[in-house]
Swiss-Prot record:
Family listed: Belongs to the UPF0173 family.
One Pfam family from the record: Lactamase_B_2
Keyword Chloroplast (UniProt): no
Alphabetic keyword roster: Hydrolase
Matching PANTHER family: UPF0173 METAL-DEPENDENT HYDROLASE MJ1163 (PTHR43546:SF3), UPF0173 METAL-DEPENDENT HYDROLASE MJ1163-RELATED (PTHR43546)
UniProt name for this protein: UPF0173 metal-dependent hydrolase PAE2160
Gene Ontology molecular function: hydrolase activity
Organism: Pyrobaculum aerophilum (strain ATCC 51768 / DSM 7523 / JCM 9630 / CIP 104966 / NBRC 100827 / IM2)
SUPFAM superfamilies: Metallo-hydrolase/oxidoreductase
Amino acid sequence: MQIKWFGHAAFMVEVGGARLLIDPWISNPLSPATPQDVINARPTHIMITHDHFDHMGEAVDIAKATKAPIVGTFELTLEVAEKGIPEAQTMPMNIGGTIKLGDGIELYMTPALHTANRGAPSGFVIATPEGTVYHAGDTALFRDMELIGELYDIDVALLPIGSVFTMGPREAAIATQLLRARRVVPMHYNTFPLIKQDPEDFKARVEAVSRAKVFVMKPGDVLKV
């Protein structure tokens, strides 16, 4: 399994024959890639945690070009249908639900403490034969992260640290502890001035409370698990 970061909250998780694109704001200021680069990579699924612009990004354009289905809350899939995505090309779900993609890959939708234009904000757990990834979406710290860790045995947690709109480094370090994740990648920071953070501060805080290994990625980097 490998995880590529495009900056902000945008990732591609590749495992087996699946290429799972998450929150594809590929035109974000930190991204070294273009939407066309991502189209050329042929994602098999597009997963959206909520419908704010910095998470929806170019999802609709990428879906139209690749025919990859969009996975999100029921309300979010209605929203993309209004933008020209056929209903058959959507995979609606809701918090607490599971979608099985085949080859042992399962998607679980988790809660997130945030807002959305339509529907509820969410996170995703991607469980695969090669490991389990948790993308928290935009969220504050919440106690049930401990339950998420107990249920899903997290190998890699992708956590926002930008503060202002999400949890910051202190809270994200506690989230790492609650999740009992083996590895953690900070995201959703330094994209614009309001969410400027030092990832090394986050790393130090994690190391003080957890055995998790922190991977501070640069946009374009790939983490192999």
